[in-house]
């Protein structure tokens, strides 16, 4: 089972709820306690901590996609929304969150666990 955002990153869940409510997006704010973390972005950029709350599509999200840029005190938070549901939380330039996201999803870019010791070739 995928972890709840609220359990895995409670401070991020609180921040999202607060920012969404302050911006008048109460319908989206009510989704935050129920968001499950499916995966992280695998782009490899050292400033990216993006999280998927639905499986990443093969290609574009499609015609019912929207995005919402929030105004956090640091970094960037951008929500990808499909059919009025949060499907991705783009988290950029937030090293505090990146470290924790990498701990939650430590696989390499191919989605395989790295060996704990010894040979690290895949």
Give the positions of each predicted feature.
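Aromatic- and glycine-enriched beta-alpha-beta binding-site module
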Residues: 62-111
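N-terminal domain-onset segments
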Residues: 1-66, 101-122
């Amino acid at each position: 089972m995928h972890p709840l955002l609220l359990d895995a990153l409670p401070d991020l869940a609180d921040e999202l709820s607060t920012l969404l409510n302050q911006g008048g997006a109460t319908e989206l704010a009510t989704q935050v306690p129920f968001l499950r973390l499916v995966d992280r972005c695998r782009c490899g950029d050292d400033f990216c901590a993006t999280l998927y709350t639905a499986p990443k599509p093969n290609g574009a999200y499609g015609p019912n996609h929207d995005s919402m840029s929030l105004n956090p005190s640091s970094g960037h938070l951008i929500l990808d929304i499909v059919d009025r549901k949060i499907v991705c939380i783009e988290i950029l330039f937030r090293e505090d969150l990146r470290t924790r996201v990498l701990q939650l999803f430590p696989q390499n870019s191919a989605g395989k666990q790295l060996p704990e010791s010894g040979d690290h070739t895949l």
